[in-house]
């Protein structure tokens, strides 16, 4: 066993899995960029208070899962557990909300939560996110949802479903809160769950314990108590999804794990992942900007799990991503040949050809075995005699045929053989 290993719940991605990781991440981002979303890079850690206030102190994320520590200046900082609060902070700090609205941003990277590691649920999780801030328009909600749907489908994933609901607005939420608390306080709940019911009763509906889920099965449903404005908003979102041909199912009992969600809320699930079936989700957060010290502007966004999407693709027997295999493998048999082939490799790479070289003193047989293992279609073979003659051996690794080609013509000859 090696002396050092990755921390528990923190995965490495090495070839060939890393190629799929990059393809999934970039595929999900591309769907957002095509809709006019600009890229934003966020700090890995932020002021702890940002997440406590933005995500919600009653959530499991803040109360149980954050990586929080004091830096050398005795400031409390936290490794980011999610992206929305950081994006909203950046929008306010840089005055992006003073320009054209909505502000459309996308991002990708690692996020950190102290959870029990299992398949698809890591302590360092990789996500792609989208945020649209500044416009309260159900058509924008539908666009954001459609971007996520298009991102998954662009990867060839099709065994997922979209679940949607509405968490209401400032008019109906307080009334529903009282109704839900009255129901919950009539149950035989443990002290910790009763505390959460008093602080934020929706958190109890998000409890994953079977005994709690059984007790709350008959809880009142927020969809049945929407205000006229919230109902109209939700109906319009659904109409737009229908027009965009984005299939969905309404899940009236969906509760997201973050406190800032209002109105439209959604989740993408894939049954091939077992209990941890979510591959992404999001919703509208109309009060978060003001809560974090900015203008009273609405927003909507999502976070899609790169790790979980990879598992979903695997469950469907699908793979994406360009492998690290090369097109051409150089076999230098002398120091001078090594220099010549390095120059040719640079010229071929500049033309978009993937080239690798044999390094070290492998000898011809060892180098050719490496060429075969590389997956290359063509090998360039040269020794001192070839260099003196101004030629390089170009070998088709499929047929075994080898011809001598003048050094000046090697690049064009190889590109022709590869059908480029």
Curated annotation (Swiss-Prot):
Keywords: Aminoacyl-tRNA synthetase, ATP-binding, Cytoplasm, Ligase, Nucleotide-binding, Protein biosynthesis. It catalyses: tRNA(His) + L-histidine + ATP = L-histidyl-tRNA(His) + AMP + diphosphate + H(+). Its EC number is 6.1.1.21. Coiled coil: none annotated. Signal peptide: none annotated. InterPro entries: aa-tRNA-synth_II (IPR006195), aa-tRNA-synth_II/BPL/LPL (IPR045864), Anticodon-bd (IPR004154), Anticodon-bd_dom_sf (IPR036621), His-tRNA-ligase (IPR015807), HisRS-like_core (IPR041715), HisRS/HisZ (IPR004516), HisRS_anticodon (IPR033656). One of its GO terms (biological process) is histidyl-tRNA aminoacylation. One of its GO terms (molecular function) is histidine-tRNA ligase activity. It is found in: Cytoplasm. GO terms for cellular component: cytoplasm. It is an enzyme of class 6 (ligase). Homodimer. Belongs to the class-II aminoacyl-tRNA synthetase family. This is Histidine--tRNA ligase. It comes from Mycobacterium marinum (strain ATCC BAA-535 / M).
């Amino acid at each position: 066993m090696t002396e050092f290993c990755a921390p528990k719940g923190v995965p490495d991605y090495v070839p060939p899995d890393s190629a799929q990781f990059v393809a999934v991440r970039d595929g999900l981002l591309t769907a957002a960029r095509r809709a006019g979303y600009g890229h934003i890079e966020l700090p890995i850690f932020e002021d702890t208070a940002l997440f406590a206030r933005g995500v919600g102190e009653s959530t499991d994320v803040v109360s149980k899962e954050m990586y929080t520590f004091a830096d050398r200046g005795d400031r409390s900082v936290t490794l980011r557990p999610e992206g929305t609060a950081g994006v909203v902070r950046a929008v306010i700090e840089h005055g992006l909300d003073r320009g054209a609205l909505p502000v459309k941003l996308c991002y990708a990277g690692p996020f950190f939560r102290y959870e029990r590691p299992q398949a698809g649920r890591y302590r360092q999780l990789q996500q792609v996110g989208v945020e649209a801030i500044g416009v309260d328009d159900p058509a924008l909600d539908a666009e954001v949802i459609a971007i996520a749907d298009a991102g998954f489908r662009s990867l060839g994933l099709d065994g997922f479903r979209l679940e949607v609901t509405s968490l209401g607005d400032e008019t109906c939420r307080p009334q529903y809160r009282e109704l839900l608390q009255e129901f919950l306080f009539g149950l035989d709940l443990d002290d910790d769950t009763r505390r959460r019911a008093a602080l934020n009763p929706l958190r109890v509906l998000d409890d994953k314990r079977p005994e709690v889920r059984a007790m709350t099965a008959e809880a009142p449903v927020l969809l049945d108590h929407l205000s006229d404005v919230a109902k109209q908003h939700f109906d319009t979102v659904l109409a737009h999804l229908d027009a965009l041909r984005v299939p969905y199912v309404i899940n009236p009992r969906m509760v997201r794990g973050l406190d800032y969600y209002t109105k439209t809320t959604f989740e993408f699930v894939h049954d091939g992942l077992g209990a941890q079936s979510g591959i992404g989700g999001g919703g509208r957060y109309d009060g978060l900007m003001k809560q974090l010290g900015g203008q009273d502007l609405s927003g909507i966004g999502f976070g899609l799990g790169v790790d979980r999407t990879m598992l979903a693709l695997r469950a469907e027997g699908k793979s994406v991503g360009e492998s690290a295999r090369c097109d051409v493998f150089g076999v230098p048999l002398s120091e001078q040949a090594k220099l010549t082939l390095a120059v040719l490799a640079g010229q071929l790479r500049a033309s978009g050809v993937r080239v690798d070289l044999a390094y070290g003193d492998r000898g011809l047989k060892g180098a050719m075995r490496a060429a075969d293992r590389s997956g290359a279609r063509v090998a360039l073979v040269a020794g001192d005699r070839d260099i003196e003659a101004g030629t390089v051996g170009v070998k088709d690794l499929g047929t075994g045929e080898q011809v001598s080609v003048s050094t000046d013509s090697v690049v064009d000859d190889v590109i022709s053989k590869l059908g480029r």
